[in-house]
Amino acid sequence: LDKNFDRVSQIKNMTLTACGSSINAARFGERLMKMLDCFDRVTTIDAADFNDDDFPNIEARETGIVAISQSGETKDVAHVVQQAIDRDITALGVVNTVGSDIARAVKMGVYCNAGQEYAVASTKAFSAQVVVLALIALWFRQTRDYLGGSHHDLDTARLKEALMRLPISFGMALGLRDSCREIA
């Protein structure tokens, strides 16, 4: 995001789009972005339900889209990304698969690097997507503060602390694996 500061710092309206398990991560990201007041308007759209009227009718440079996909190949999400690009809307990708269609189509993005999922429930990718969206929300909040000359609020500080504690929390949870196996 820093490399594209001039472009992304102009975004006032953000749309998050995804399908399947990733739509839940998108909804979480929307709530965080609203809580942190990152944008004037934040919405989440299931890419399968998307239509052309879902983009706000404002200048393209003030609009952004975050496309979230585990595989990076989700056709409905890729379609929304292409619609955004055709309108010169800034598109960011949050994908798990390096070199995927969505990763190649967007101008910037984040690879989750959660590893391959082996189950229907996308727990690893979902967890990684939530963390990445939290970091993206913090970046935009920090940018808004920088441009507006304001300072970080309590919600921002709490989110940063929670993210810093994640490795310890996950380590503790993994340490309970044997106990859970015995109980089960």
Where are these regions (language model features)?
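Active-site phosphate/pyrophosphate-binding segments
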Residues: L1-T15, M108-A184
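Anionic-ligand anchoring segments at beta-strand to alpha-helix junctions in alpha/beta enzyme folds, i.e.
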Residues: L1-I65, E73, I85-G99
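Predominant activation on well-ordered alpha-helical scaffold segments within soluble catalytic domains
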Residues: R27-E30, K34, A78, L133-A137, ...
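Phosphate/diphosphate-binding loops
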Residues: T63-Y146
